[in-house]
Amino acid sequence: EDTAQAIGADYKFSDGNTVKAGTIGDAGATSFFPSKNLGAYGDGGAIMTNDDELAAKLRMIVNHGQSERYYHDSIGVNSRLDSIQAAILKVKLKYLDGYNQAREEVANKYNSAFATTDHIITPVTADFTSHVYHQYTIKLKDASKRNELNKYLAAQGVPSMIYYPVPNHLQKAYSYYGYKEGDFRITEDLCSRVISFPIHTEMQNEQQDFIIENVLKFFSY
């Protein structure tokens, strides 16, 4: 289960049981990259599991494949979280719920503001989930406006990002599968229509108002 951008999010099963993202499957992986909701000061990540056998195998893989020092049972990597990053994350962890709540408040303000225009489709949160808004990403109804909006906002001093502009099936690394443009039309359509606006725990009202004002101004021309 990939929870690189979803740490702290909830998922509610049909029986009413609610669990955290990353604990639904046999194992869940998350990222502690500095920009994440729970970020370290350098690279880092974690895998969560209740399976003792799997946990032992994972600990071995991330430590050069060693079952004990100098004895390599498998091919592994050096993926050990250093003590500095662990100490930072231990302190920040107690603030995670507050971080996520702050992001949700920023997202709700965006959603309310952009509901006033027909040009934007805001993020949807299903009733059985919660959203932690690692990114605030909207869809434009008119894909031809996306790059124009990105350039316009930059000219006004408003950062916006087009994340993951090339879908996996069109990446050179996966070209051996033989997929071509048009094979995954919905994916390609979404890649052409999404754009992300600033969101973080320390965002001030004046900053967000300025962003909203300029986004809406673009669509008023």
Regions inferred by a protein language model and the residue ranges of each:
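PLP-dependent aminotransferase class I/II
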Residues: 6, 10-16, 50-221
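Active-site PLP attachment segment
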Residues: 23-59, 66, 86
